[in-house]
Amino acid sequence: MAFCTLHFFSEALNREVSVNAFVPQNREGYKTHGLSDDQTVWQRYTEVELDAAQAGIAVIMPNGDRSFYTDLSSGDRYFTYISKELPEMMTRFFRGISPAREDNYIAGLSMGGYGALKAALTFPQRYAAACSLSGALDIPFMFDTYKVEGEAFYKSIFGSKEDFVGSTNDLFALLKKDAQNGVKLPEIFLSCGTSDRILPCSRRFYEECRMFGIPVSYTEAEGNHNWAFWRQQIKPFIRYIGSKT
């Protein structure tokens, strides 16, 4: 298992970016971070290197800043970067990383959970499975009840709530569209702590999946919106990926 930090110019973001990676061979996984973190947190706060080595998978950890992994009106195309440019760059840098759907997985926590599911629902042909830990999946809910950042912050990314609903950033609209079109979706894994203030986001998404008959693995466990919870909850998903090797 090799660890490396890559620096390259991103056409989507029009600047130099850095990506951390653990790389063995054969399999690939993407980990997206939360709103107040960066690309180093997975390796600093979890046992992801050991878990990935045991599973025999590569782990790619990009920095999404505070973008909600969205193409912003300011010109920074974070979603394009995460979902298109980054995978292409990784297969170019590492011979052992496969572009095949069955070899690619994506996971994230909080804001990153939203980003992971958006990538999986927008480009279901690219991922075998997607995992959201304590995901900020219901953006109107975040507008109304999660005031840590304030409404102006969410508006700067998504526009108004009225603009957001039904847009390409709306996970529930994407899920409905995919279900109605009979799209073969990646396997979906959701997990959230019972003391987490944004638990309603995961519950609502789970119920929507059930309503459309979409298979989903759902876990509620004791815990809050913190690394003590995420450190444990990412392990089953990594083991799942390893079982597919």
Where is each model-derived feature located?
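Non-catalytic cap/lid and distal C-terminal segments of serine-dependent acyl enzymes
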Residues: 1-245
